[in-house]
Amino acid sequence: MVIAGSISAFEPKGHPEIVPSYEDALRDYEEQVKILTREGVDLIVLEMFARTVDLKAAITAATETSLPIWVGLSCERHDGQIYLGLVGRHGGETIADAVRASSSSNVKAFCIMHSPPQVTADALRELQNSTSLPIGAYAHGGGVYDQPVNVRGVYDQGGQAPAGQPLDWTDPERYLEYAREW
């Protein structure tokens, strides 16, 4: 059995266009890594990263443990391009930027996670073109739309719900169609 310790992106997580200081993020991640390693995890999983400043700080903190690191990237589509992002927001950084920012021999895999299902296949292709490491995916469980919809609010062009809106209308068959592309 392998026990993974999970670390998520630094606040403001839902706003990848707002960039925290590297030093603040590093302090936060060092504290989290210290707790996880003290408790005996075998692997560090970095989840929902949508900014390279967070990613660099988390990798620096996790690398000090010598444990394997899996990097999880969250992505959005905007004007036909895939960017690191969450809930319809991005800061202009790409998957290739994230892979370049992940320069540690402890990084053993990359995943696309917590991204719209209709974006995940294209994001995986970009990830595959950016790294030779193993890749994986798991998308959001909600909000699977091919076209913008207007259910309890206005949705953006990527089919994402505005912040605070529930993502509870997933059609399981449509989600499966997307997942088969992965």
Language-model region placement:
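Domain-level signal for soluble alpha/beta catalytic cores
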Residues: 1-182
